[in-house]
Amino acid sequence: MAFILSFWMIFLLDSVIVLLSFVCFVCVWICALLFSTVLLVSKLNNIYCTWDFTASKFIDVYWFTIGGMFSLGLLLRLCLLLYFGHLNFVSFDLCKVVGFQWYWVYFIFGETTIFSNLILESDYMIGDLRLLQCNHVLTLLSLVIYKLWLSAVDVIHSFAISSLGVKVDCIPGRCNEIVLFSSNNATVYGQCSELCGVLHGFMPIVICFI
């Protein structure tokens, strides 16, 4: 897991999927029960019957309570996600990421500056990923917590790496913050996911955890 919040995001998504599956199962079961009951009564009376349903306070309270409990469970998980999103983790070092048209600039350790551009197709080597290779990669240490500050200079960019569960907007005049942590060595790829101009699809992101 590389992004601190990715665990809680996956946990929340799994909870929603389980809840939706349970609700769908209950709805299908109730529909099947009603349909089979209507058919059974119709065959016994040899007519197509219509029923007059009356209100039931017990059923209203029951369904309201069950639905409220499910909603409360999802709300608590969402509150945990928001809490960890604003929690200040003790980080080993700081990395600044600035988006330009159409490349990324990384400021590492307060003094190292890396300009990351898309390499030309003529410079590709065997095994390189098209539109995902850049001339300089962001190299970070695994098992180390990093704090990333993200901003932009010209237009709105989006620092997105799907394998890490990361998608943060880089807005001129504003500094957004995320925390990265990798438990193993890996190389991850991403791109700018904001329509930032004619070369929007040519801003690759490569992070190598060593």
Curated annotation (Swiss-Prot):
Binding site residues for Cu cation A1: 157, 192, 196, 203
Mitochondrial intermembrane topological segments: 1-20, 87-210
GO molecular function: copper ion binding; cytochrome-c oxidase activity
Subcellular location: Mitochondrion inner membrane
Binding-site positions, Cu cation A2: 192, 194, 196, 200
Subunit structure: Component of the cytochrome c oxidase (complex IV, CIV), a multisubunit enzyme composed of a catalytic core of 3 subunits and several supernumerary subunits. The complex exists as a monomer or a dimer and forms supercomplexes (SCs) in the inner mitochondrial membrane with ubiquinol-cytochrome c oxidoreductase (cytochrome b-c1 complex, complex III, CIII).
Family, similarity comment: Belongs to the cytochrome c oxidase subunit 2 family.
Protein's recorded name: Cytochrome c oxidase subunit 2
